[in-house]
């Protein structure tokens, strides 16, 4: 927080993030006023003025489409495609990261098959998982719990209903995205989740996004471009998967997937960068301000030490304890200990 207020502009992923940021500033810093106009928050402190705005990051649609249809990507996906063997696909593409809520996603899939056993031979759950922070004990335990749960589900239903593909291979993941019926993004919290945008752009099967309402991408996809879920609600997640697979008409799926693709393509990563560069040139300043606020250089180099060179409006924030284990980690540890 101390470093962020030293900037002239602070870019965040979503409007909700901007609201949280400005609220935090008002809680931690004295004599702060915040006003908003046209999506731009202007923050005044004792010493200076700066701005905050949402810049939702985009993708490079043309590039991801080229990769998805490349021969290299198809070769990388061929073995997984063979195991799928014509079944409907629920897909997730994520790092092995507790906030991604992978365990609950698997539990929702297990519940789906428990409640609708006719789907056992007709649907598979393809996991494209990238190992992450393997040197951290909690992450290793989380990865182990995923592996155990995958095995448990496959043993339970007597089929390879979950296909667990490990490794960082963008081409393989994008090739899989071309075929999904459902792409599941049930993160506990996520700044954006670009994989959802990539999936929307490359999918050729009228696939539908099922997205956590706490993922940044949902703020762009919530109005008719996806199905929203509460990430901790396993039953709602299972119901949403079933809705796409068996209740939505082909026309409904086509309409939703087309809208998602249009949204994901409409604001690219190039636009995202250009918007920030444009705003940094002063165009962001609202029209009701008589003249642009000049960039202000303030002594923030020593912001993290006890120097008195800090602006008076910037005070040291209290140290906090590390956050507790997030709920999905607790669920996964119970599985790992079984």
In which residue ranges do the predicted regions lie?
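Catalytic cores of carbohydrate-active enzymes across secretory and cytosolic contexts
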Residues: 1-337
């Amino acid at each position: 927080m101390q470093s962020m207020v030293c900037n002239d502009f602070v870019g965040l992923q979503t409007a909700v993030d901007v609201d949280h940021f400005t609220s935090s500033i008002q809680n931690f810093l004295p004599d702060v006023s915040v006003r908003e106009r046209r999506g731009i928050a202007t923050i005044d402190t004792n010493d200076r003025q700066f701005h905050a705005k949402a810049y939702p990051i985009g993708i490079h649609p043309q590039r991801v489409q080229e990769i998805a249809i490349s021969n290299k990507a198809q070769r990388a996906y061929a073995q997984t495609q063979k195991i799928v063997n014509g079944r409907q696909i629920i897909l997730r593409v994520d790092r092995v990261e507790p906030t991604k809520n992978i365990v609950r996603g698997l539990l929702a899939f297990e519940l789906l098959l428990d409640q609708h056993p006719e789907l056992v031979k007709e649907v598979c759950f393809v996991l494209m998982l990238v190992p992450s922070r393997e040197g951290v004990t909690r992450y290793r335990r989380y990865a182990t719990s995923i592996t155990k749960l995958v095995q448990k589900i496959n043993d339970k239903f007597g089929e390879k209903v979950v296909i667990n593909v490990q490794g960082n291979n963008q081409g393989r993941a994008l090739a899989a995205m071309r075929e999904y019926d459902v792409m599941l993004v049930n993160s506990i919290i996520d700044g954006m989740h670009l994989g959802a945008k990539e999936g929307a752009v490359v999918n050729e099967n009228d696939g539908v996004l099922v997205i956590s309402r706490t993922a940044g991408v949902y703020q762009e996809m919530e109005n008719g471009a996806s199905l929203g879920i509460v990430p901790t609600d396993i039953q709602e997640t299972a119901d949403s998967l079933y809705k796409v697979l068996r209740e939505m008409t082909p026309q409904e799926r086509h309409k939703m997937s087309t809208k998602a693709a249009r949204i994901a393509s409409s604001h690219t990563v190039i636009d995202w960068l250009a918007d920030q560069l444009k705003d940094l040139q002063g165009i962001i300043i609202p029209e009701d301000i008589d003249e642009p606020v000049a960039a202000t250089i303030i002594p923030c180099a020593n912001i993290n030490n006890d120097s008195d060179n800090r602006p008076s409006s910037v005070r040291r924030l209290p140290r906090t304890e590390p956050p507790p284990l997030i709920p999905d980690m607790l669920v996964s540890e119970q599985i790992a200990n079984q």
